[in-house]
Swiss-Prot record:
It holds the Pfam family RecU. This is Holliday junction resolvase RecU. Mg(2+) binds at residues 86, 88, 101, 120. The record marks 103 as: Transition state stabilizer. The gene is recU. Its main location: cytoplasm. Residues 1-34 are annotated as: Disordered.
């Protein structure tokens, strides 16, 4: 049995047939929690086509109880997912380090900043200081947004100074770049990175 930090047990995702996956809408409305799956498929596409090498960081697990039925075998009876201290994804594109977090919300008017933790913000700041490309991909209001880390820090500092604890829909739309959904790649965030960080170098 594996538990998350909030005490809930881990439930494996149900298998989705290829036929159903092909019918997915180009809108994120009423889609459920699929952002991570779509990003993982996108990263597989980037890797297979030698575009970028981006991987999801494994969630750290704390093992609590191990049973040894045999000396040569060990069975994990109880474990907990530990809270990640950094971000979800990292890798490399055209020689630049890429580091980003993926977040979703069902809130219809704002994106709650409680989705982030202090140590994640500090990690992103450290990446930016080293000239890494750091950002957040946010699924909200039926769309997907690319928000640069520097823009996120502005909203975070406002919260830390007893200001608003969320990003309003209009604020997010003004500060971020919308990501058009496709089939392959599904969420083409590299095209935005190319425009922001590499088009001026050519």
């Amino acid at each position: 049995m594996i538990r998350y930090p909030n005490g809930k047990t881990f439930q494996p995702n149900k298998t989705v047939s290829s036929q159903n996956s092909q019918k997915r809408s180009h809108s994120y409305s009423n889609r459920g929690m699929t952002l991570e799956d779509d990003l993982n498929e996108t990263n597989k596409y980037y890797l297979a086509n030698q575009i970028a090498v981006i991987h999801k960081k494994p969630t750290p697990v704390q093992i609590v109880n191990v049973h040894y039925p045999k000396r040569s075998a060990a069975v994990i009876k109880e474990a907990y997912f530990k809270q990640s201290s950094t971000t979800d994804y990292n890798g490399i594109y055209k020689g630049r380090y890429i580091d980003f977090e993926a977040k979703e919300t069902k809130n219809k008017t704002a994106f709650p900043l409680q989705n982030f933790h202090d140590h994640q913000i500090e990690h992103m700041k450290q990446v930016v200081r080293q000239d890494g490309i750091c950002f957040v991909i946010i699924s909200a209001f039926g769309k997907v947004y690319f928000l640069e880390a520097d823009k996120l820090f502005v909203f975070w500092e406002r919260k830390e100074n007893n200001g608003r604890k969320s990003i309003r829909k209009d604020e997010l739309e003004d500060a971020s770049f919308p990501i058009s959904l496709g089939y392959s790649p599904r969420i083409d965030y590299i095209s935005i990175i190319e425009q922001l960080y590499f088009s001026q170098e050519q």
